[in-house]
Amino acid sequence: MGHFTFTGLCLLAMFLSLRGAECYTCPIDWLPKNGLCYKVFSKHKTWFDAEKYCRKFKPGCHLASLHSNADAVEFSEYISDYLTGRGHVWIGLRDTKKKYIWEWTDRSRTDFLPWRKNQPDHFNNNEFCVEIVNFTGYLQWNDDNCAALRPFLCQCKY
């Protein structure tokens, strides 16, 4: 009976909402968007440790992937609200082959790359992980050394 009640309420909410309701449940302090849940973490970690931290939540969790300017704007507002002045933020994009071939940790398509001017540059042949840059209002990206310590943005399928 409870399953039918939840399903019925979800359908009712979808019909009553102007945008439609997303019928999944994110943990209370996570941001729901496009069937996924997102959370920014202020603890500074290397890119690899941040990816490992995201994966510990459950299968299907990774550093976040962004696929449109609308996503970038929404996440810039979300990150700015939680990390005022706390530095750049790791996302799940990396050049694993070190040949300017950028890949997301969730294996989604690489279809949106809002790089800062003159980026990516693999500076000193040592920058292969991607961060959202704070002084661009968290709207543009830079490649950086994967060992740098940064806050990070996780995404999970719940």
Curated annotation (Swiss-Prot):
Keywords: Calcium, Disulfide bond, Glycoprotein, Hemagglutinin, Lectin, Metal-binding, Secreted, Signal. Expressed by the venom gland. It is found in: Secreted. Ca(2+) binds at residues 119, 121, 127, 142-143. It holds the Pfam family Lectin_C. SMART domains: CLECT (SM00034). PROSITE patterns: C_TYPE_LECTIN_1, C_TYPE_LECTIN_2. CDD domains: CLECT_REG-1_like (cd03594). Disulfide bonds join 26-37, 54-154, 61-156, 129-146. Glycans are attached at residue 134. This is C-type lectin BML-1. It comes from Bungarus multicinctus (Many-banded krait). The lineage of its organism: Eukaryota, Metazoa, Chordata, Craniata, Vertebrata.
